[in-house]
Structures are given as C-alpha cells and as structure tokens.
A protein has these predicted regions:
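Secretory targeting and sorting signals
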Residues: 1-34
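Terminal, non-catalytic domain-edge segments
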Residues: 35-67, 211, 388, 402, ...
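Low-complexity, Ser/Thr/Pro/Gly-enriched N-terminal "stalk/linker" regions
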Residues: 35-121, 132-186, 214, 218-247, ...
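Solvent-exposed loop and edge beta-strand segments that line ligand/cofactor-binding
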Residues: 100-119, 176-194, 244-264, 303-334, ...
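Well-ordered alpha-helical scaffold segments within catalytic/enzyme domains
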Residues: 120-136, 196-215, 263-279, 325-337, ...
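A short beta-strand element within beta-rich, extracytoplasmic domains
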Residues: 522-539
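Carbohydrate-binding surface patches
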Residues: 613-638
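C-terminal beta-strand-rich structural cap/linker in extracellular carbohydrate-active enzymes
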Residues: 662-679
Length: 679
C-alpha cells in the first residue's frame, strides 16, 4: 500500500507563520523561458473564459520513453500539456513557471514544467466547455490534453495503469522529482494523479463516445488500465478497517483519502453513463462506500464536530480542508446521497458563516488561506446533491449563489478572485486577507469549472454578483493559553504544533492538572454553545464546564481508544454535549477532575451565526442556529425593496417562505437547519 502525501500539512506550521500555504504559491526559483502572456479584455456574455487556460496549454513532442505512449503517437507526435504555474510581470502580463528549482543550462525544473494533476483537470474543463457550448476548439484541446494525460500513464510493466506526475519542458518524464512527493517514483503506487486521471478519462470517454469512436475505444482501454491499478493496489484491502483512535476507518481509499477517491468516483460515474464495465462499477461503488464511512453521523450533526461534513482523510478524525473536498459530489453521483445532503445542508451553512472554504480546519480554524479549489469543491457538491435529491434544489441554489460569490468579492480579501475578461483566477487568499496574484493551472482550472457550472445553472448565476461581506458572525476559537490559569495549569509549547493528524492553535495547549482550571473570556454569543478542544488520551481526566455560576456539564478527555493506525497519539477534537451558555455569560471556566487534561482551545458557537453579503444594491443573508430549538433573531440586509425569507431543515428541504418590506428582517431560524434572506 501507498503512503499518503499531505502537502498542506507537511508545511502547515510554516504556512501559518508566513501566511501562505504550498497550495498558494509555486515552489520555484529562476525564470521561465516561455513568451509572456499579453492582457486581453473582450466583452463576454458568459462567465467562462478559457483564454488564460489556452495560454497555459502548450504542445510538446516527447522523446521515446519506455512504457509510455498515447493515441496515434506516430501520426501525431505532439501532445497537449499545461504549464503548472504563472507569475505576474510588472506590466500585468504573466509568465510560465514550472515546479521546483529552475536550471537554465538544461532548461529543466526540479519537479517539471507540466504535471498530471493539472493536465487531467484541464482536460475536464475543455470537455465540459465543449459539451456545454459546442466549441470545436475546446473539443480539439480536450483531445490533445487527453493524449498528453495518457502519455503520462504507464502502459506496461508492474506499474501499469499508474501515472507519472511530472514532465520537463522537452517532454522528458521525471518520475522522481525534487522536492519529493509520495509515492516515489510517482508511478509506483496509487495516487491523487491516478484518481484524477480516472476523472479525466471517464468524462473524456463519455464526451467522445459518439464523436470519435476510435479515440473513445482507446480511452476505454486506458480507463480500464487505471481501474485495474486501483483494484490491485487499493481495493486489495476492501472490507478491512484501520483503527483510528478507537474508531474504524476504511482501509481501501486512494491515498487513504476521501478527497482523492472522490475524484476517481467522478470519472467512474461518467464512465458508467456510457455503459462502463462491471469491474469499473464495482470499483466505483466500493470507493463510494469507503468515502461514505468518513461521513459525520446524523445524530447532533448541527452541534458537534465536524458539523455534518464528510472527512477528507481516513487517518484523522480531527481535520477538514476545503481543497479537493468533492466528497459530496462524488457520493451524490454514485447514488449515496444521504451523506452528501448532510454535508451540503448542515455543514456548508456552518462553514460559510464561520469563515468560508478554508484550507485547514484542524480542527480549529488554523489555516485560513482560501483557494479556488476549495470554493469550487463546495459549489460542485451543492449542484450535484441537488440533482441527486431534487427536493433540495432551492436550498442548493441559495447556498451555491453564496459560494459562487466568493469569486466576485464575497471572500476575506473583499476582491474579485476571477476575472471574466481574462479567464484568470488568482492563486489564493492568504490567512491575513492579502491576495496571491499568481494565476497557475489549478486555480485557473477550478475557477473555470465553477464558471462553467454557473453558466449551466442560470438560477444560481443570477445570485452570483459583485459582493462584499457586510457582516459575519460564526464559530470562533479562544486559545486556552490566553485564559487565566489556576491550580497548577501551565502552558505547553510543543516542538511542533502539527501533530501528524491535527494542529494545535496559538502557541500550544494548556496542561490542566486535576483540580486546575482555565477561565477564558467569550466573544458575544447570545446563549450559544462551547465545545472544548481537547487532546483526548486514554486515562485523561474530564473537564467540568461552568459559566455565570451555572454548570453546563462535563466532557471526558479520556473517552478515546488507543492510537492504533492513527499517525499520532491522542485525538485533538472539539467535544460537545454541554448545555447552552447563559446569555449573559462573559467567560467560561473549565476545571479538570479525575486526571490531567490537555486543553487547546474553546470553540464558541453563537446562538445564531450569520453571513451577510452586500451585493451592489441587493443583499443576501445566511443564518443558522446552534440551539436545539428554533431561534428568533433579526438581521439587517442591504438593498431596497422586499426581502424574501426562506427557511430549510438540515436536509435541504424548504420549510417556509415569506416576504417583508422591513429594513431589519425578523427571522425564525429552524433548529439544525438554516435560513436565507434575499433582497
């Protein structure tokens, strides 16, 4: 079996220090040799503009390399590829950049110029654009990019079906790149890029089945080769379970990930639409089964971690990340809709009101950087869930409109992240709200996938406008070390804040011995909930929680299994089950009983969380409650005219709809559900 590469978490401590994750910036030095891109500015009637993606796309003629070939390589030696990164020039144009250190003498990069992760997803963009618009240029680009993708796939030998990740500017493959990513060599085991290859091949086969039967037959052979690779390297453990801190987790996911496996499922679902194969269907259903096992339980989903989400990584119960989180979309398309519904209509309202599609809830809001890959994953999942469960269409439209507005200013930076005049999507928003104005392949691709989705869903597109965040009140975490420590409680600064499966907030945690206490001040909450974020370990004590001279209950830090297959001892997680805070409580005190407790933070859930968007003469508000019964509140929504108030339950079913002329709108937010107000 493979080792899982977690690029985000390998650098997360450094990333939070400098405000930039590896996902936001090219790991490169030196200058590229390509011609700079010139600025364009055509007037557009649709959102999706492929100009920048076209500029990133180049054709190369690779040398003969053992085990690698593609469709009609002798007749058409040039294949499609895609530059990995793009950095801005002083004049506003962009230049191509590869991955790793550039060597001008050999015109090579430590990793390469082009990579399978991006080429596969670029093929999906071209395929969807062609299918949606009939654009023959996109058909031709999809054809060439799929030929490039299948060239990267190893066609013979013990690694057949797997995929080499990196290619140099002259078409030479680089199976062992610097810096190293696992698996190494990159075609030696199942990987993210194998999963994304299946995604591209599945959608490619569906698109070309009638258009070019010969090419479709080739794609069918190659997707079956990839399916065989998953079957022998991943599903050889089907039915087995890992022991993650005392709870089972599926052992049969690509790279141990719900995220990676989801992208394979997307391709396999498309493949099945063309007839597929019995084996491919089995692989799809087994991967979907594993993803579904990472779903949050339905009980108390709205008030306990992870708030209804499908987790992305089988080896951790403590984290969620925005990038690649297409698990709900995959489950919906594979016919396993219940977890997708919970993720879309319980988790998404919590996520959007508490900050948006961050790169890392670990479990606190540690990595606040945001990228298009995260926003797009939420958008695609909402739309796919609505197709699988038509009764949720209105709820999905409302939430997707809010998610889509991320690209047009409804984000922590308050700026457009996508420019329809050029087709560029910026590479991300740093944790401090500054923007990384690079525009590489991944950001471009997922920006365009979102724009294609909006072009194909006019009802959602009408809700996506120039926006700024007028108000946001949601889940926050108060670090334990900022509190008043008594009874021998002491701050501990671990050597690394990253544990291997989660991440401490602030400077570390507080070691609270039996009888010791921590008192932390609370933000405004109006009678919300607190969830102590505790490093649970067998034999640890419990925390008795009080506020305003009232006992809210206790949480057991020792109620956890042994480490088992988890990457780190202990389980850093928010613990729920406490009574609601008194409305006037300005602080909360946590006292250890029966043993020491490692307290990282206190997660505070307001009685009513809200996100309010100012949309150029209009306004939208999203509200959710942490209480166990319906909650009355008011919200001031920008804009003129009547406001429409719609309420939904946690399964996305509409409960009520009404209109009002009031400037300040009264709303009854349903328990475990949410409400939207649109003016």
């Amino acid at each position: 079996m493979h080792l899982r590469t977690r690029r985000l978490f390998a650098v997360v401590a450094m990333a939070t220090a400098v405000g930039l994750t590896g996902a936001l910036a090219p790991a490169s030095t030196g200058t590229a040799t390509a011609v700079p891109q010139q600025q364009t500015g055509a007037i557009r009637t649709t959102m999706a503009n492929l100009d920048h993606l076209d500029w990133l796309s180049v054709e190369v003629t690779p040398p003969v390399q053992e085990g690698h070939t593609t469709y009609r390589i002798a007749e058409e030696p040039a294949i499609g590829t895609l530059w990995t990164y793009a950095e801005p020039n002083p004049d506003g144009s962009y230049r191509h950049v590869g991955g790793g250190t550039y060597d001008p003498e050999t015109d090579t990069w430590g990793q390469g110029a082009f990579n399978a992760d991006d080429m596969t997803r670029a093929a999906v963009v071209y395929l969807r654009h062609w299918q949606q618009t009939g654009d023959t240029a996109s058909r031709d680009a999809a054809y060439q990019m799929l030929r490039g993708v299948t060239y990267l796939q190893t066609a013979t030998g013990p690694n057949a079906g797997n995929v080499v990740l990196w290619m140099q500017p002259d078409g030479t493959l680089n199976p062992s790149a610097e810096p190293v990513e696992l698996p190494d060599p990159s075609d030696s085991d199942a990987s993210y890029w194998l999963a994304r290859t299946i995604w591209a091949l599945g959608e490619g086969l569906a698109a070309f089945a009638d258009e070019d039967p010969a090419f479709a037959a080739f794609l069918r052979d190659r997707i079956e080769l990839a399916v065989d690779a998953v079957d022998r390297q991943v599903l050889d453990r089907y039915g087995e379970h890992l022991d993650i801190d005392g709870e089972p987790a599926p052992a049969w996911l690509v790279a141990d990930g719900g995220d990676a496996s989801a992208e394979a499922v997307l391709g396999l679902a498309a493949y099945q639409q063309t007839g597929g194969s019995e084996r491919a269907a089995t692989v799809m259903h087994r991967l979907a089964e594993g993803i579904a096992e990472l779903a949050a339980p339905a009980k108390d989903a709205a008030t306990s971690w992870p708030f209804g989400a499908v987790r992305p990584w089988a080896l951790s119960r403590s984290l969620w990340h925005g990038w690649g989180a297409q698990m709900p979309a995959a489950l919906a398309r594979a016919g396993v809709a219940a977890p997708a519904v919970r993720d879309s209509f319980t988790f998404d309202p919590w996520l959007l009101t508490s900050g948006g599609p961050d790169n890392g809830r670990l479990p606190s809001r540690i990595d606040r950087s945001q990228i298009a890959y995260g926003a797009d994953s939420r958008l695609q999942s909402l739309l796919a869930t609505a197709v699988a469960r038509p009764a949720t269409r209105t709820a999905a439209t409302d939430l997707a409109g809010i998610v889509g507005s991320w690209y047009l200013g409804a984000n922590p930076a308050g700026v457009r992240m996508y420019d329809p005049a050029t087709g560029r999507t910026f590479d991300g928003i740093n944790h401090d709200g500054t923007v990384n104005r690079n525009s590489g392949a991944e950001s471009t691709i997922h920006g365009l996938l979102s724009m294609l989705a909006l072009d194909g869903h006019p009802a959602v597109a009408r809700r996506v406008t120039e926006s700024t965040i007028a108000a946001r009140v949601g889940s926050t975490s108060v670090e334990a070390e900022t509190g008043a420590l008594t009874g021998g409680a002491t701050t501990v600064a671990p050597e690394s804040l990253w544990t291997g499966e989660s991440h401490y907030g602030g400077d570390g945690y507080v070691d609270v011995p039996a009888g010791g206490s921590v008192r932390v001040d609370l933000p405004r909450h109006h009678g919300g909930l607190v969830l102590p974020v505790v490093d649970q370990r067998p034999g640890a004590g419990r925390l008795v929680v009080t506020a305003a001279n009232r006992k809210l209950g206790s949480v057991d830090a020792g109620e956890v299994g042994e480490q088992g297959d988890s990457p780190a001892p202990g389980l850093l997680a928010p613990l729920g089950g406490l009574d609601a805070l008194p409305r006037d409580a300005g602080s909360v005190t946590l006292t250890a009983r029966g043993g020491a407790v490692a307290l990282d933070a206190v997660m505070v859930e307001p009685a009513v969380s809200r996100l309010v968007l100012d949309q150029d003469g209009h306004g939208t508000a999203l509200l959710r409650t942490s209480r166990h019964d319906k909650t009355r509140t008011t919200v001031r929504v920008p804009g003129d005219g009547r406001a429409t108030v719609t309420t939904y339950d946690g399964r996305g079913r509409r409960l009520s709809s009404s209109t009002t002329k009031a400037r300040t709108v009264a709303v009854v937010v349903p328990a475990a559900g949410f409400a939207t107000v649109r003016r």
